[in-house]
């Protein structure tokens, strides 16, 4: 289940390149997908930051507003080694909006402040807008061809390496927890470890569909998602031909399991496939069941939107694209070239 061993949609690249030679080579801006209400007991703060991770900024905002750390929320984690524009939410019932022009934190700039009625929770984004500068590319012709394929055919919707912690530590700890080698009491760590476990199982399912030649082929019992929506339905044998046509034109997406405490939501051939692939991961599945993690489904294909690129020279390309919330730029870049700086963290 190592990220480096997962299957490729467009074949393993031969070309090499560098991601984030400089922090400004990686820019990501959150798209809330809604306009703040302008009133309410929550204050939304949009920050441009560099050299600061999300939790560090949240802690400093809490101190500035003189509230508990748990009263500051955000929609997702962003890498410190990048330039990011991110929303934070402060719960300030019955209080005036602080003067955020007085908020000083090295590497941070306040861009916007607005009142809102609801708390900003993890995943409550439309998506993220990315601008990457990819350098030291060894074969521009190969990468150009791959860019064209990715723009039209997409990439596997893998969870990126950062989901599993530095050096895969979160997944390692999840395995130790699953086999009762450790006890995990801290809420944040429990969340990180459980997320790593189910993400690894999802990645395995996606990779094995590629290996089996059914990544883009509807199986009887597959859970199919309407493109751009969260709802899904189960494919019936009698409808496979029509459903395959709808998949081929982009109306539908095949999904894979995000395992938890409950039924996987598939039947027939698809259920048998998922059972077989996950047959040697009983310890992680038992952990997710024991901790009552809600099961879910996630599309196996990620299609970047508004994707454009411009070559600065034969070894440098600027790439822009939009991704839905919860998807990873890592999954796009890994289909383009092999990273020379493979430890680079790409924001979610």
Curated annotation (Swiss-Prot):
Residues 154-303 form the TRUD domain. InterPro entries: PsdUridine_synth_cat_dom_sf, PsdUridine_synth_TruD, PsdUridine_synth_TruD_CS, PsdUridine_synth_TruD_insert, TruD_catalytic, TruD_insert_sf, TruD_pseudoU_synthase. Pfam families: TruD. Substrate binds at residues 26, 128, 328. The keyword Kinase does not apply. CDD domains: PseudoU_synth_EcTruD (cd02575). The active site is at 79 (nucleophile). It is an enzyme of class 5 (isomerase). Keywords: Isomerase, tRNA processing. It catalyses: uridine(13) in tRNA = pseudouridine(13) in tRNA. One of its GO terms (cellular component) is cytosol. One of its GO terms (biological process) is tRNA pseudouridine synthesis. NCBIfam families: PRK00984.1-4 (NF002155), tRNA_TruD_broad (TIGR00094). This is tRNA pseudouridine synthase D. It comes from Edwardsiella ictaluri (strain 93-146). The gene is truD.
């Amino acid at each position: 289940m190592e990220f480096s061993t997962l299957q490729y949609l467009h074949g393993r690249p031969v070309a090499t390149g560098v991601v984030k030679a400089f922090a400004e080579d990686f820019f990501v801006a959150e798209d809330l997908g809604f306009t703040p209400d302008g009133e309410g007991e929550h204050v939304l703060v949009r920050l441009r930051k560099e050299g600061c991770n999300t939790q560090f900024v949240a802690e400093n905002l809490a101190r500035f507003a003189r509230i508990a750390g748990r009263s500051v929320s955000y929609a997702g984690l962003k890498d410190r080694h990048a330039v990011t524009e991110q929303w934070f939410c402060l719960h300030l019932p019955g209080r005036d909006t602080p003067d955020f022009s007085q908020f000083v934190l090295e590497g941070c700039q306040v861009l916007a402040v607005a009142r809102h009625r609801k708390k900003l929770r993890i995943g409550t984004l439309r998506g993220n807008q990315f601008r990457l500068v990819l350098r030291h590319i060894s074969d521009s012709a190969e990468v150009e061809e791959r860019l064209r394929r990715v723009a039209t055919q997409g990439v596997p919707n893998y969870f990126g390496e950062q989901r599993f912690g530095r050096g895969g530590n979160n997944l390692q700890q999840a395995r130790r927890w699953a086999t009762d080698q450790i006890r995990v009491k801290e809420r944040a760590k429990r969340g990180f470890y459980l997320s790593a476990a189910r993400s690894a199982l999802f990645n395995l399912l996606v990779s094995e569909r590629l290996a089996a030649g059914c990544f883009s082929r509807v199986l009887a019992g597959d859970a199919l998602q309407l493109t751009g929506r969260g709802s899904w339905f189960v494919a019936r044998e009698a409808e496979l031909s029509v459903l395959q046509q709808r998949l081929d034109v982009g109306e539908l997406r095949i999904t894979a399991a995000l395992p938890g405490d409950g039924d996987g939501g598939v039947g027939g051939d698809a259920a048998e496939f998922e059972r077989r692939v996950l047959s040697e991961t009983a310890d992680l599945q038992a952990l997710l069941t024991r901790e009552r993690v809600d099961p879910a489904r996630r599309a196996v294909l990620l299609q970047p939107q508004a994707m454009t690129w411009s070559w600065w020279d034969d070894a440098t390309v600027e790439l822009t694209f939009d991704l839905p919330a919860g998807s990873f730029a890592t999954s796009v870049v890994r289909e383009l070239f092999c990273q020379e700086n493979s430890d680079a963290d790409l924001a979610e």
